[in-house]
């Protein structure tokens, strides 16, 4: 049975026409409210576009041998992310997906079911009302998408525990004020970290989130490899490859440490000795350095951490997230709408391809009129 108000109004994202209860401002930025029937936040469209492109790339690389890609779209709301996977991925990849969509809002799920009804691959999707934390543990997953309202910390351990032998986990965090150091109490309580309020605060926030993912993975004999780390408007998002490896889990602390601003010469020497700074930087005074966890700086006023000190992305995957690739997934048949969607799609991957070989692999996607900063 269709939900009250069906068919509602059309909303186009990528090349997928989705039905929602009320009109959505396609250009809206920033966070949305936690409550509401038929929830859909257009500010997360870039997040979903990158999700489509990453799944396309990884289905042919890291997950190439997986015939049925067991996927969970937790906190799915009306299901726009899953529908974009089904409609915008090449058919040979989309047909491999076995998706479970779950949410606590029954009305949103009714809209999701009705939206799926005419999708050719809708039969490969199950729509479940329930707590994502319970559904995560219902089976092993090759692809896990965590997109909560606020902090992802309540879901991290369960997600890592639920991964298959090799899996991809995408983690969104909208508690940006905490992760970027503005709200120190929540940052300390949730992540056990501190972040210095400086131009690198969002980089540090991404690294704190990666560090939390690495620690959670290690608790369950897993090891992470960062694939993409993005600050986009009001949220942070990291995507990691997760492999089962007791040896890798034992060594997780090798990639956890501290960021020190205005370092002393001793800090520089420690960073070089730990392999976190090139030897040719000896004698210089960089703006900041990474130090290993064992360094435990005594002066915490210029320190961020504990956080991830390794690279934050995979160059091959990042090169696949090009403006051209993003534009190609936008083709509804309406040239005017397609042009607009192509603009949004290209914006969602702006700078990623050309930063593929950057040593920090940090991507900052901000307002269209602002430039990326590292």
Each predicted region: which residue ranges?
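Short beta-strand element of Class I
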Residues: 96-100
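Conserved beta-strand signature within the Rossmann-like core of class I S-adenosyl-L-methionine
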Residues: 166-174
């Amino acid at each position: 049975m269709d939900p009250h108000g069906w068919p509602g109004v059309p909303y186009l994202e990528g090349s997928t026409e989705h039905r929602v209860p009320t009109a959505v401002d396609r250009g809206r930025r920033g966070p949305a409210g936690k409550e509401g029937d038929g929830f859909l936040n257009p500010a997360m469209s870039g997040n979903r576009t990158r999700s489509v492109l990453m799944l396309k790339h990884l289905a042919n690389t890291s997950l190439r041998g997986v015939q049925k890609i067991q996927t969970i779209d937790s906190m799915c709301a009306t299901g726009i992310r899953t529908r974009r996977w089904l409609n915008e991925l090449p058919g040979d990849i989309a047909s491999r997906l076995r998706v479970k969509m779950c949410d606590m809002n029954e009305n949103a799920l009714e809209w999701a079911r009705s939206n799926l009804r005419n999708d050719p691959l809708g039969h490969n999707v199950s729509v479940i009302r329930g707590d994502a934390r319970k559904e995560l543990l219902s089976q092993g997953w090759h692809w896990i998408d965590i997109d909560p309202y606020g902090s992802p910390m309540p879901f991290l351990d369960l997600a890592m525990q639920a991964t298959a032998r090799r899996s991809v986990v995408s983690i969104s965090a909208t508690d940006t004020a905490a992760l970027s150091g503005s709200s120190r109490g929540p940052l300390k309580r949730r992540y056990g970290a501190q972040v210095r309020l400086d131009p690198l605060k969002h980089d540090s926030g991404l690294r704190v989130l990666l560090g939390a993912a690495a620690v959670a993975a290690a608790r369950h004999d897993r090891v992470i490899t960062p694939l993409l780390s993005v600050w986009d408007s009001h949220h942070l998002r990291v995507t990691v490859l997760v492999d089962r490896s007791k040896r890798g889990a034992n060594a997780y602390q090798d990639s956890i440490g501290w960021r020190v601003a205005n370092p002393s010469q001793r800090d520089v020497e420690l960073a070089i000795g730990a392999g976190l700074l090139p030897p040719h930087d000896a004698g210089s005074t960089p703006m900041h350095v990474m130090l290993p966890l064992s360094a435990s700086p005594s002066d915490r006023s210029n320190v961020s951490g504990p956080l991830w000190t390794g690279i934050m992305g995979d160059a091959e995957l990042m090169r696949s997230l090009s403006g051209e690739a993003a534009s190609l997934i936008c083709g509804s048949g309406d040239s005017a709408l397609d042009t607009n969607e192509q603009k949004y799609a290209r914006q969602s991957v702006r700078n990623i391809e050309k930063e593929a070989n950057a040593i920090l692999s940090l991507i900052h996607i901000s307002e269209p009129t602002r430039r990326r900063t590292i």
